[in-house]
Each structure stands twice: as structure tokens, then as C-alpha cells.
Amino acid sequence: MLPAANIGDLFLIGTGGFIGASLRYTISSRMPKIRSIPAGTLTVNFLGSIVLSLLTFSSEPESVVYLVNIGILGSFTTFSTFAYETFKLLEDGQNVSFFLNIFLNVILCLLGVGIAYFALRL
């Protein structure tokens, strides 16, 4: 477990949060929906799963964990947006897209973790 954060750690987390949120907006705003599925959220969650796993499995120093894992990737990936967009699909009566979005997010993010895990074992 990581120790309590000091001001330097909080600065790294905040800086990373700014970078991650900016990247998420940039990617998500340029991705079209595919069959009503919010591809931007799916893309950032998939990419974030890969990068987070690569860093976690390779035991990076705490400063990298604060900046990248917690800061950048914490604001880059987004479970709350995924939940809202998925619920909106259900509310709009797009039942197939609702289930497909859940399936794709879970499977692709797990696949991303697996890719990172096995890539570091090569």
C-alpha cells in the first residue's frame, strides 16, 4: 500500500489528472459512435487498461504511480461515463447496444490487461 501523499505527490497526481482528462476529451470527442456504442469511452478504457497494466506489472517507482497510474490514467479512463452512457442506451430502447457496450467494455479491458501481462513476459 502506498503511504499518505505529501504535497509533491498531490502535485504529480493533479498534473497527471489534467493530462489524462485532456487526452480523454481529445480522443472521445473525435470518435464516432459505432452502432450507438460510445466508441470514445470504449477506446480510452481499453487503452487505459493496457497502459495501467503495463506499468503495474513492471513495478514502476512511486512517482510514476502517482503521475501516471493515479493521475493520468485515473482521469483518462472513466467508469462513471461508461455507466451513464450504457444506461442511456437502455433508456433509449437500444437493448442490443446496451448489452454489447457492457460486453465490449468488460472483455476489451480484460484483454488489455492480458496483453500487458503477457507482453512483459516475452
From Swiss-Prot:
The chain crosses the membrane at residues 1-21, 37-57, 64-84, 98-118. HAMAP family: FluC. Its main location: membrane. Belongs to the fluoride channel Fluc/FEX (TC 1.A.43) family. One of its GO terms (molecular function) is fluoride channel activity. One of its GO terms (cellular component) is plasma membrane. It is a multi-pass membrane protein. InterPro entries: FluC. One of its GO terms (biological process) is cellular detoxification of fluoride. This is Fluoride-specific ion channel FluC 1. It is found in: Cell membrane.
